[in-house]
Amino acid sequence: MNHPRGERVIDGTFYKRARVEGNELGYNTIAAAGAHACVLHWIRNDGPALSGDLLLLDAGVEVESHYTADITRTIPINGKFTKAQREIYEIVLAAQQAGIDAVKPGAKYRDINNACMKVLAKGLEKLGVLTVSAEQSLNPEVGIHRRWSVHASGHMLGIDVHDCAKARGEQYLDGELAVGHVLTVEPGLYIQPDDLLFPEEYRGIGIRIEDD
Protein backbone atom coordinates (compact mmCIF):
# COMPACT_ATOMS: atom_id res chain seq x y z
CA MET A 1 0.00 0.00 0.00
CA ASN A 2 2.73 2.48 1.04
CA HIS A 3 0.12 5.11 1.92
CA PRO A 4 1.18 7.85 4.39
CA ARG A 5 -2.04 7.27 6.35
CA GLY A 6 -2.70 3.71 5.32
CA GLU A 7 -4.08 2.79 8.73
CA ARG A 8 -6.80 5.43 8.31
CA VAL A 9 -7.66 4.13 4.84
CA ILE A 10 -8.12 0.61 6.23
CA ASP A 11 -10.11 1.90 9.21
CA GLY A 12 -12.44 3.88 6.94
CA THR A 13 -12.89 1.01 4.51
CA PHE A 14 -13.93 -1.36 7.29
CA TYR A 15 -16.30 1.24 8.76
CA LYS A 16 -18.07 1.55 5.42
CA ARG A 17 -18.56 -2.22 5.21
CA ALA A 18 -19.80 -2.36 8.81
CA ARG A 19 -22.46 0.26 8.10
CA VAL A 20 -23.53 -1.36 4.82
CA GLU A 21 -23.57 -4.98 6.01
CA GLY A 22 -24.53 -4.50 9.67
CA ASN A 23 -25.69 -1.90 12.15
CA GLU A 24 -22.45 -0.32 13.31
CA LEU A 25 -18.89 -1.03 14.39
CA GLY A 26 -18.81 -3.33 17.38
CA TYR A 27 -15.95 -1.27 18.85
CA ASN A 28 -13.25 1.10 17.70
CA THR A 29 -11.28 -0.58 14.93
CA ILE A 30 -7.60 -1.31 15.56
CA ALA A 31 -5.72 -0.95 12.27
CA ALA A 32 -2.13 -1.17 13.48
CA ALA A 33 0.69 -1.34 10.96
CA GLY A 34 4.33 -2.00 11.75
CA ALA A 35 5.36 -1.35 15.35
CA HIS A 36 1.93 0.12 16.13
CA ALA A 37 0.80 -3.52 16.41
CA CYS A 38 2.79 -3.68 19.66
CA VAL A 39 0.35 -1.16 21.20
CA LEU A 40 -2.58 -3.27 22.41
CA HIS A 41 -5.41 -0.85 21.68
CA TRP A 42 -3.98 1.30 18.93
CA ILE A 43 -7.08 3.17 17.72
CA ARG A 44 -5.46 6.39 16.44
CA ASN A 45 -4.99 4.61 13.13
CA ASP A 46 -3.05 7.51 11.66
CA GLY A 47 0.17 5.82 10.60
CA PRO A 48 1.48 4.57 7.27
CA ALA A 49 1.01 1.05 5.95
CA LEU A 50 4.34 0.15 4.39
CA SER A 51 5.54 -2.77 2.32
CA GLY A 52 7.48 -5.17 4.51
CA ASP A 53 5.45 -4.39 7.63
CA LEU A 54 2.62 -6.38 9.16
CA LEU A 55 -0.93 -5.10 9.61
CA LEU A 56 -2.82 -6.13 12.75
CA LEU A 57 -6.53 -5.58 12.11
CA ASP A 58 -8.79 -6.08 15.14
CA ALA A 59 -12.34 -5.26 14.06
CA GLY A 60 -15.92 -6.40 14.40
CA VAL A 61 -19.34 -5.62 13.00
CA GLU A 62 -22.33 -5.11 15.29
CA VAL A 63 -25.42 -6.59 13.67
CA GLU A 64 -29.02 -5.34 13.93
CA SER A 65 -29.61 -7.38 17.10
CA HIS A 66 -26.71 -5.42 18.69
CA TYR A 67 -24.56 -8.51 19.13
CA THR A 68 -21.04 -8.07 17.84
CA ALA A 69 -18.17 -10.02 16.36
CA ASP A 70 -14.55 -9.57 17.48
CA ILE A 71 -11.97 -10.84 15.00
CA THR A 72 -8.24 -10.15 14.63
CA ARG A 73 -5.98 -10.97 11.72
CA THR A 74 -2.31 -10.12 11.25
CA ILE A 75 -1.17 -10.07 7.64
CA PRO A 76 1.92 -8.94 5.71
CA ILE A 77 1.11 -5.75 3.82
CA ASN A 78 3.05 -6.86 0.74
CA GLY A 79 1.70 -10.41 0.94
CA LYS A 80 4.97 -12.02 2.08
CA PHE A 81 6.19 -12.76 5.60
CA THR A 82 9.81 -12.25 6.50
CA LYS A 83 11.43 -15.23 8.23
CA ALA A 84 11.15 -13.53 11.63
CA GLN A 85 7.52 -12.51 11.06
CA ARG A 86 6.58 -16.03 10.03
CA GLU A 87 8.28 -17.59 13.06
CA ILE A 88 6.31 -15.40 15.47
CA TYR A 89 3.10 -15.86 13.48
CA GLU A 90 3.37 -19.64 13.57
CA ILE A 91 3.90 -19.63 17.35
CA VAL A 92 0.78 -17.51 17.84
CA LEU A 93 -1.24 -19.62 15.39
CA ALA A 94 -0.27 -22.83 17.21
CA ALA A 95 -1.18 -21.21 20.53
CA GLN A 96 -4.59 -20.22 19.20
CA GLN A 97 -5.26 -23.74 17.97
CA ALA A 98 -4.34 -25.10 21.41
CA GLY A 99 -6.79 -22.66 22.96
CA ILE A 100 -9.55 -23.60 20.52
CA ASP A 101 -8.94 -27.27 21.28
CA ALA A 102 -9.47 -26.51 24.98
CA VAL A 103 -12.94 -25.03 24.36
CA LYS A 104 -15.53 -27.64 25.32
CA PRO A 105 -18.46 -27.96 27.71
CA GLY A 106 -17.28 -28.64 31.25
CA ALA A 107 -13.84 -27.09 30.82
CA LYS A 108 -12.93 -24.17 33.04
CA TYR A 109 -12.61 -20.85 31.30
CA ARG A 110 -9.04 -20.41 32.49
CA ASP A 111 -8.07 -23.69 30.76
CA ILE A 112 -8.17 -21.83 27.43
CA ASN A 113 -5.65 -19.22 28.53
CA ASN A 114 -3.43 -21.85 30.11
CA ALA A 115 -3.36 -23.86 26.88
CA CYS A 116 -2.41 -20.80 24.84
CA MET A 117 0.26 -19.65 27.26
CA LYS A 118 1.90 -23.07 27.32
CA VAL A 119 2.46 -22.94 23.55
CA LEU A 120 3.63 -19.32 23.61
CA ALA A 121 6.15 -20.04 26.36
CA LYS A 122 7.52 -23.08 24.54
CA GLY A 123 7.81 -21.08 21.34
CA LEU A 124 9.74 -18.32 23.08
CA GLU A 125 11.96 -20.92 24.71
CA LYS A 126 12.73 -22.38 21.28
CA LEU A 127 13.68 -18.91 20.03
CA GLY A 128 16.16 -18.67 22.90
CA VAL A 129 14.82 -15.51 24.54
CA LEU A 130 13.59 -16.96 27.83
CA THR A 131 16.11 -16.81 30.66
CA VAL A 132 14.43 -19.85 32.25
CA SER A 133 12.71 -22.92 30.85
CA ALA A 134 9.18 -22.65 29.51
CA GLU A 135 7.99 -24.80 32.40
CA GLN A 136 9.57 -22.44 34.92
CA SER A 137 8.21 -19.38 33.13
CA LEU A 138 4.67 -20.78 33.32
CA ASN A 139 4.89 -20.62 37.11
CA PRO A 140 2.64 -17.65 38.01
CA GLU A 141 5.38 -16.31 40.28
CA VAL A 142 7.85 -16.21 37.36
CA GLY A 143 5.95 -15.46 34.13
CA ILE A 144 8.86 -14.21 32.03
CA HIS A 145 6.96 -15.07 28.83
CA ARG A 146 4.34 -12.48 29.83
CA ARG A 147 6.83 -9.78 28.84
CA TRP A 148 5.73 -10.53 25.25
CA SER A 149 2.17 -11.71 25.87
CA VAL A 150 0.55 -9.05 27.99
CA HIS A 151 -3.13 -9.97 27.88
CA ALA A 152 -5.33 -12.97 28.49
CA SER A 153 -6.01 -15.22 25.53
CA GLY A 154 -9.70 -14.47 25.16
CA HIS A 155 -12.93 -13.23 26.70
CA MET A 156 -16.65 -13.87 26.65
CA LEU A 157 -18.50 -12.19 23.79
CA GLY A 158 -22.04 -10.91 23.41
CA ILE A 159 -23.84 -7.58 23.36
CA ASP A 160 -20.76 -6.19 25.08
CA VAL A 161 -17.50 -6.94 23.29
CA HIS A 162 -15.99 -7.99 26.63
CA ASP A 163 -19.15 -9.57 27.98
CA CYS A 164 -19.28 -10.25 31.74
CA ALA A 165 -15.88 -8.59 32.18
CA LYS A 166 -16.85 -7.40 35.68
CA ALA A 167 -17.88 -10.85 36.88
CA ARG A 168 -16.18 -12.37 39.91
CA GLY A 169 -13.23 -14.63 39.24
CA GLU A 170 -14.94 -17.74 40.54
CA GLN A 171 -17.81 -17.13 38.13
CA TYR A 172 -15.67 -16.15 35.15
CA LEU A 173 -12.10 -17.48 35.21
CA ASP A 174 -13.04 -20.53 37.27
CA GLY A 175 -16.47 -20.89 35.73
CA GLU A 176 -17.31 -23.91 33.60
CA LEU A 177 -18.04 -23.56 29.91
CA ALA A 178 -21.47 -24.68 28.79
CA VAL A 179 -23.29 -25.17 25.51
CA GLY A 180 -24.32 -21.74 24.20
CA HIS A 181 -21.39 -19.78 25.63
CA VAL A 182 -19.75 -17.50 23.07
CA LEU A 183 -16.13 -16.49 23.51
CA THR A 184 -12.99 -15.42 21.71
CA VAL A 185 -9.60 -17.12 21.55
CA GLU A 186 -6.90 -14.52 20.87
CA PRO A 187 -3.30 -15.16 21.92
CA GLY A 188 -0.66 -12.66 20.89
CA LEU A 189 3.04 -11.86 21.00
CA TYR A 190 4.37 -8.30 20.95
CA ILE A 191 8.05 -7.47 20.59
CA GLN A 192 8.65 -3.79 21.23
CA PRO A 193 10.94 -1.90 18.82
CA ASP A 194 13.49 -1.34 21.61
CA ASP A 195 13.42 -4.88 23.04
CA LEU A 196 17.08 -5.87 23.21
CA LEU A 197 16.31 -9.44 24.28
CA PHE A 198 15.28 -10.20 20.70
CA PRO A 199 17.54 -9.93 17.63
CA GLU A 200 16.90 -6.79 15.59
CA GLU A 201 14.90 -8.52 12.85
CA TYR A 202 12.18 -9.42 15.38
CA ARG A 203 11.81 -6.00 16.97
CA GLY A 204 8.59 -4.16 16.23
CA ILE A 205 6.65 -7.32 15.39
CA GLY A 206 3.22 -7.56 16.98
CA ILE A 207 0.94 -10.48 16.14
CA ARG A 208 -2.50 -11.44 17.42
CA ILE A 209 -4.92 -13.96 15.90
CA GLU A 210 -8.50 -13.98 17.15
CA ASP A 211 -11.59 -15.99 16.31
CA ASP A 212 -15.00 -16.24 17.97
Region roles according to the model:
Residues 1-212:
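Active-site neighborhoods and metal-handling regions in enzymes and metal-associated proteins
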